[in-house]
Amino acid sequence: MFCNQCQEALNVIGCTKNGVCGKKGEVADLQDRLLYVLKSVSYYNLKARELGLNEETADKIVLDAFFATLTNTNFDKQAIESYIKKGFEIRDSIKAKLPAGTLPAEEDLPDVAKVTPENITGMDVAVHSTQNEDVRSLRELLTYGMKGMAAYAHHAYILGYKDEEIFKFIEKGLVATTDDTIGVDDLIGLVLECGQKGVSVLALLDKANTETYGSPEPTAVNIGVRGNPGILISGHDLLDLEQLLEQTKGTGIDVYTHGEMLPANSYPAFKKYDNFAGNYGNAWWRQNEEFEKFNGPVLMTTNCIIPPRESYRNRIYTTGVVGFEGLPHIHEKEDGTKDFTSLIEQAKMSKPPEQLESGTIMGGFAHEAALSVADKIIDAVKTGKISRFMVMAGCDGRHKERAYYTEFAKALPENTVILTAGCAKYRYNKLDLGDIGGIPRVLDAGQCNDCYSLVVIAQKLAEAFGLEDINDLPISYNIAWYEQKAVLVLLALLSLGVKNIVLGPTLPAFVSPNVLKVLVDNFNIRPNTTVEEDMKVLLG
């Protein structure tokens, strides 16, 4: 295997035997093959799309299977093999529908169009099959950005929201990574287009979530426990949460969020459930100790799952695109619903959660809530009560170097406000940083996709101050990345013209020196260093 798609890539180069994440080499190799099959599906669906014959089954397999290859999402060999089998079936179905003359002669077809279940095992389809370092780097940057795009499009899709242009771009991008006639300049263009489409998919998901569940509102979220047995839900999927809450109401079972599900506590639609108890624990990487102490069943809805300990292995379930060998999987029924009876019955026989902490933390400051007090914020900036906004969005991770973000938040002057989204928030959202005239010094917009809210807030503030360039606002960016959703968010920010981003805790292993130079020259991206040095740069 060779995998360097996440921030934990071994020695900032790549994992070659097993992943630091826990992914086995055999699964990594299968995921490489799956990705190549999705490129083949995309080749034919693009041809079909030109004729109005494209299939939604192709769009769905690309979203689902692409998402399954994200870091910490699907470790199940059989699930990946099933995606490969289904991909070939859909590919062949599309191919059979194409009118004669649509395709080149068989001998002129590219390899990606001729791949079969029989010959794919002997093909070199891994990252290093691309020899040119810069082409390889740009193909990876594009691929990982599109993985994030597929994940967000998947979340919107299950709520009934889709955008054909996003499907089309993902297919175009996947096929482009197999075309040796597409050089560095064109790949840079595709990477930038990926960022533009990233803004579109973030806006689509924001619309899907808010139109379905209401706009998040400032909420004091309980982080303690109650005396009832509970079910813990982790990941990002709000539809799974809705169904779980509906099925557990009146049962005496409480439901707690974990990790990136924390922002669900701020959506109006979920507040009607008396058994929605609050948030338990912290970011994904602490799940081993926290799931162990929860005592009840745990539902993993999307990334991020890590190899479970034996102590709770008999009470952790996967659903959706998540998979881990040996764990029970809750499948979606034909009508789109899921039956969580097995979790509910197990919860009834479980002890209540062990308390980890107590009190509340504030959330729910997405763009609508933040902009509802825009006048107050603008006045605070004009009077000097707020000197700067610090965007500290992104991902958390287990490396000790990430303590930097806690220390950075502590060291910020008292007249600065942190804007955050994603699980990076757990490094500082429980610090007592106070408020500025009633405005909390940590404004949490939500999940990683809610970085879109931070962009909307910045754009509206720029309008209010009469600025044409959001880089002229008193806003700085200290972004923490971990996986491929964060890659897309970064590309989306760049496509909007955001410059001077500090990125950490390490730069992506897949970015070559020449590609990094392009990012530095055009956007002034730089790696984080020390709290003291970065504070000087970011506070201007």
UniProtKB/Swiss-Prot annotation:
InterPro entries noted in UniProt: HCP/CODH (IPR004137), Hydroxylam_reduct (IPR010048), Prismane-like_a/b-sand (IPR016099), Prismane-like_sf (IPR011254), Prismane_a-bundle (IPR016100)
Subcellular localization(s) per the UniProt record: Cytoplasm
Molecular function per GO: 4 iron, 4 sulfur cluster binding; hydroxylamine reductase activity; metal ion binding; peroxidase activity
Catalytic activity: A + NH4(+) + H2O = hydroxylamine + AH2 + H(+)
Modified residues (Cysteine persulfide): 395
Main location group: cytoplasm
Cofactor: [4Fe-4S] cluster; hybrid [4Fe-2O-2S] cluster
One matching Pfam family: Prismane
Residues binding [4Fe-4S] cluster, per UniProt: 3, 6, 15, 21
Cofactor descriptive note: Binds 1 [4Fe-4S] cluster. Binds 1 hybrid [4Fe-2O-2S] cluster.
Binding site for hybrid [4Fe-2O-2S] cluster: 236, 260, 304, 395, 423, 448, 483, 485
Gene Ontology terms: cellular component: cytoplasm
Organism superkingdom: Archaea
Enzyme class: oxidoreductase
GO BP annotation list: response to hydrogen peroxide
EC number per UniProt: 1.7.99.1
PANTHER family named in the record: HYDROXYLAMINE REDUCTASE
Function, as annotated: Catalyzes the reduction of hydroxylamine to form NH(3) and H(2)O.
Entry similarity comment: Belongs to the HCP family.
Protein name in UniProt: Hydroxylamine reductase
Organism, as annotated: Methanosarcina mazei (strain ATCC BAA-159 / DSM 3647 / Goe1 / Go1 / JCM 11833 / OCM 88)
Lineage start: Archaea, Methanobacteriati, Methanobacteriota, Stenosarchaea group, Methanomicrobia
